[in-house]
């Protein structure tokens, strides 16, 4: 008798995606982050659903409703902090997932990569809108500053900002629509994730060597299901340590003060996972230039397939580009640090140098090093 998982129309899809999927035998733990992101998305949707049951998207009651969730709802504090810190875990996994793709040349799967870039934008916009919902000081001023950036668009900018606000400032209409979008976007993200996987399964997974692995494939289950479960346990342990012992470690104390349009916080800054982009935005004195640099800092990922000059796919056997890659990682950490610092000397110049380095490494140095490494392979020493 044929196994039902191979014949049933629905189970067949699951079987081909997670059970009998042929996977390279040599993929390392860097390939765990896809499944971890799936778990993060599930955690966020579930905790978010329960939060939405008690939250009110009105400027008068939003802050109080979050306080009510933490104080009066059964395990409300746990749900709220799992959602807030779950977002941080989501971005940690996202950055590592993208970093893995850059290191091992996974961006040569064009469709999968481009859907991934769209997903990154969708997750970032969802997180930004979610940060506005508690209606604390940093929520209000963060929303004001970031939405105001659209006013840099020539001719239609001011009208566009007022249209997004639903008035002449960030107010009740803004909060209501941000809640609506914050609720719907994770489901759009889920649909995009399915498309992302669909394109990935058309080509099969990449592997650390970047070489064709068709001759050496193993079934996804049980080998990689067990491996993924280990990753999930480690991530959930880390998340719960964060939630139960250091729930406010990654948050901003200013957000425990209700939003006050008459009182500007001394340092307006976004959540830690946006700081690198925020530093790039601030490093350019011109408003429109800053906005373009901000968008390009993420959109540059879509250019990676066109900037690949080497005959080798992965960085595994490319020492010069490897060095540049790790300099880029260090550079991103510097940008993250600068994004959280006040706009004063010496932070301004450090931010500007780090921003120039970021674009130079990706657009100029890495493609050149790829060409040099190819030439080095032809040397007969």
Curated annotation (Swiss-Prot):
Cited Pfam families = Cytochrom_B_C, Cytochrome_B
Cite the binding residues for heme b b562. Answer: 83, 182
Question: Where are its TM segments located?
Answer: 33-53, 77-98, 113-133, 178-198, 226-246, 288-308, 320-340, 347-367
Q: So where does heme b b566 get bound?
A: 97, 196
Cofactor descriptive note: Binds 2 heme b groups non-covalently.
Reading the lineage from the top rank, the first entry is Eukaryota
PANTHER family hit by this protein? CYTOCHROME B
Q: What is this protein called?
A: Cytochrome b
Organism of origin is Apodemus sylvaticus (European woodmouse)
Q: Which gene encodes it?
A: MT-CYB
């Amino acid at each position: 008798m044929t196994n039902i998982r191979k014949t049933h129309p629905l189970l067949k899809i699951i079987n081909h995606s997670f059970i009998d999927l042929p996977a390279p035998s040599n993929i390392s733990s860097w390939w765990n982050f896809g499944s971890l992101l799936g778990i993060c998305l599930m955690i966020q949707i579930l905790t978010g659903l329960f939060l939405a049951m008690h939250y009110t998207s009105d400027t008068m009651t939003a802050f109080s409703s979050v306080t009510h969730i933490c104080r009066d709802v059964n395990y409300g504090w746990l749900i709220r902090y799992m959602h807030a810190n779950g977002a941080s875990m989501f971005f940690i996994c996202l950055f590592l997932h993208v970093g893995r793709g850059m290191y091992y040349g996974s961006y040569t799967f064009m469709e999968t990569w481009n859907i991934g870039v769209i997903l990154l934008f969708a997750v970032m916009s969802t997180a930004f809108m979610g940060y506005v919902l508690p209606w604390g000081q940093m929520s209000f001023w963060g929303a004001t500053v970031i939405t105001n950036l659209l006013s840099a668009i020539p001719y239609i900018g001011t009208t566009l900002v007022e249209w997004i606000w639903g008035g002449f400032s960030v107010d009740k209409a803004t909060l209501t629509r941000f809640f609506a979008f914050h609720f719907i976007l994770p489901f759009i993200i889920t649909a995009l994730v399915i498309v992302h996987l669909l394109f990935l399964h058309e080509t099969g997974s990449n592997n650390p060597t970047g070489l064709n692995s068709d001759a050496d494939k193993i079934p996804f289950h049980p080998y990689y299901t067990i491996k993924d479960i280990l990753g999930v346990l480690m991530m959930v342990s880390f998340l719960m340590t964060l939630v139960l012992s250091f729930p406010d470690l990654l948050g901003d104390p200013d957000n425990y003060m209700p939003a006050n349009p008459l009182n500007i916080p001394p340092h307006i800054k976004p959540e830690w996972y946006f700081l690198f982009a925020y530093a790039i935005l601030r490093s350019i004195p011109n408003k429109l230039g800053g906005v373009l640099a901000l968008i390009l800092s993420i959109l540059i990922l879509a250019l990676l397939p066109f900037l690949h000059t080497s005959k080798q796919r992965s960085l595994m056997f490319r020492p010069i580009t490897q060095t540049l890659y790790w300099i880029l990682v260090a550079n991103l950490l510097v940008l993250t640090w600068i994004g959280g610092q006040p706009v004063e000397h010496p932070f301004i110049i450090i931010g500007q140098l780090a921003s120039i380095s970021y674009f130079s490494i990706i657009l100029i140095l890495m493609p050149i090093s790829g060409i040099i490494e190819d030439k080095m392979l032809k040397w007969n020493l």
